[in-house]
Amino acid sequence: APALRLRF
């Protein structure tokens, strides 16, 4: 995945 920390 490109953005691992999107909503974390």
Curated annotation (Swiss-Prot):
One of its GO terms (cellular component) is extracellular region. The modification Phenylalanine amide is found at F8. One of its GO terms (biological process) is neuropeptide signaling pathway. Keywords: Amidation, Neuropeptide, Secreted. It is found in: Secreted. The keyword Secreted applies. Belongs to the FARP (FMRFamide related peptide) family. This is FMRFamide-like neuropeptide FLP4. It comes from Macrobrachium rosenbergii (Giant fresh water prawn).
